[in-house]
Amino acid sequence: MEAAAPLVIEARAIAKRFGHVTALRGVDLTLEPGEVLGVVGDNGAGKSTLMKVLSGLHQPSSGELLINGEAVRFGSPRDARQRGIEMVYQDLALAGNLRIDENILLGRERTRAIGPLRLVDHAANVALAKQHLDKLRIHVKSVSQRVEDLSGGQRQAVAIARATAFDAKVVIMDEPTAALAVREVRRVLDLIKDLKTHGIGVILISHRLDDIFYVCDRVMALFRGANFAEAPLGEVERDEVIGWIMGNKRQEDAPVGAGAN
Amino acid sequence: MTEAASPELAGELVDADQQSRRSIRLMAFFDRFGVLLLVLVMGALSYAAQPEVFLSSNNIANIFRQTAFLALLALGQFLVIVTAGIDLSVGSTLALAMMSAAVLSVAGVPWPILILTPFAVGTAVGLVNGLGLTKLHMPHPFIMTLGMLNIARGLTNLISGGVPISGLPAEVRWLGAGNLVLGGIEIPVSVIAVIVSFALAWLFLEHTRTGRHIYAIGGNPQAARVSGINVDRTLVIVYALCGLLAGFSGLLLAGRTGSGFPNAGIGAELDAISAVIIGGASFFGGRGTVLGVFAGVLVIGMMRNLLNLSNVQVFWQQVLIGVVIIAIVAFDVLRRRAAASS
Ligand SMILES: Nc1ncnc2c1ncn2[C@@H]1O[C@H](COP(=O)(O)OP(=O)(O)OP(=O)(O)O)[C@@H](O)[C@H]1O
Ligand SMILES: [Mg+2]
C-alpha cells in the first residue's frame, strides 16, 4: 500500500451512527489522483452518508481520513473545500433565486475596496464565472440567468462548475444524473470525463450502471453500511455488479483485507 | 490545460429555451417595476378623486411624514423576509425604543444620548431575537419573535407604568417633525432619514458579500451552508439590523408626536409585513428589492391618504388594505403561472 502513488483520499474504517441508526460500519475507501471511482449500493446502503463524511458535512463517529497521506479532521464543508474536496449534492445545493455566476462563486465572491467599504466586484465575478464555464466548455447564453430558470441538466452543469471553480482535487457527485433526460445524462457524463483529463479525481454515486460503465475506472459496492466488493471496471461484468448491489458475490471479488468472512 | 475529451460537449448544456426568453424578460420587467406601476395607479386614482388636495406639497409631505416610521419598520422586516424569516416583534420593539428614550428624557438625560437610545434598544432586541433563534434552535422565527412581541411590549409598560410621556426635547422632535430646506424645497427630516436608510440597505444587499449571502440563505439555506457561509451569524446580523431599524422607527415616531406612548406600534408589524409583500417580496424568501419595499410602503400610505381625504371610515380602510394584499399576491401568482406555461 505505502509504496504506491500517493492517494488523494484514503478513508479507513469510517463509522457513522445517527442515534440508534448505524449508517456506516467501518468503511474503507481510496482514490488515486485523476481516478474516477464509481460507488454503488442499494437504497440506504450508506453511499450518501459516506460522501458527506468525505466532504466535511458529517463528522465520522470513528475512523480515519487521510488526504494526500495526511490525517485530517473536517469540521465543516469549508475545511474539506480548503483541501480541494468538493461535493455536488444529491439535492442540488444551488440557490435558484441567484444568478449563475453568483452560484458558482457563492461564499467565495471577489470583492474590491471602495473607500472604507468592501464591495462585491460583480464584474470580476461574472468574468471569473465565464472563464471557468469556458474552461469546462459549458456554454451559457448569459451567466446572469437565474438558476431556477434552467433545466435539470443545466443546473447540474452549474453545480459541477461550482464544485470545480477553485482548484478542486476531488469532486464527489451524488447521483448527478438521477433527475436528467437522456441527452442531458450524456453531457454530464462527458463533463466528468473532462474533469479527469484535468487531473481531477471523481467519486460518482449512481444507481445507473450505464453511467458507471461509461465513465468509471473502478467500482466499489457498499452493502448495509459496509464494504462489500470492488474491482477495476475492466475486470468485472455488469451482472456481477448488479449482484453486489443485492448482496451476492463470488469469493474472489472480495476487497483486499476487508469483509472476507 | 489538457484538451478536453469530448468536443461535442460544447453543446447547449446551459441553453435558455428560446421562446421562454421573451416572457422571462417581461417577468423581469414586472418583477422590477410592477410595484412602481401600482404607485402610479394609486397616484392617478388619488388625483382623480381629490384633484386639488392630493398634489399639494403639503399633502405629499404629509404622506411621507406619516409613512416614514412604517417605511423603516418595513425595511427591517424586508431583510428578515428575504431570509425566509419573519419578525413579529418590530411593533413592540418600536414602542420599547420610543419609551426608553421618553423615560430617560424625564430623567434629564441629554438629547444626544436620547437619540442614540432607540438605536441601542432596538439593536439589543434584534440581537436577542437572532441569538435566540439560532442558539436555542427555535423551529421557526415566528415563535422567537412572537415571544419577543410580548416581552418587549411588557417591558415598555413596565418602564413607563403604562402611561404616555410627553415633552421630548426639541432635537428629537426636529427628527420626526422638522424640515430641511434643500434647493428651496422644504423636505421633512424624517423623509431624508428614510431615503438614506433605504439607499444604505440597497448598497448592503446588492453590493456586499453579507448582503448577497442573505439572498442565498433565502433561496436555499442548505446551499448557503455548504458554500461555507456562516448562516447563523448572518441571521443574527439580519435580526439585529431589523431591530435597529425598528428602534430608529420608534425615534421618528417619538419625534413626530413629541412623546412616547406605550401603545405605539401595536399591529404595526402586520403593516410592515403587508408593505413588504405588496412590494413584491416573496414570503418564502430570496426575492424582493429595496425599491419594491419603498413602493409597497407608498402604496399603503397613499391608499390611507386617499381614503382619509375621501372621508372613508377607518374600518373600511382596514378592509380595503386586506383586499389589496390578497389581490396583489393573487395577481402575482397568475402572472407567474402564465409566464411558466408560455
Ligand atoms: N441525517 C440522518 N439522520 C438519521 N439517519 C440517517 C441520516 N442520514 C442518513 N441516515 C440513515 O443512514 C442510512 C444510509 O443512508 P444514505 O442516505 O447514506 O443511503 P444511500 O446509500 O445514499 O441511499 P440512496 O441510494 O437511497 O440515496 C439510512 O438508513 C438512512 O436512513
Ligand atoms: Mg443517497
Predicted regions span which residues?
Chain A
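Glycine-rich phosphate-binding loops of nucleotide-dependent enzymes
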Residues: E2-N261
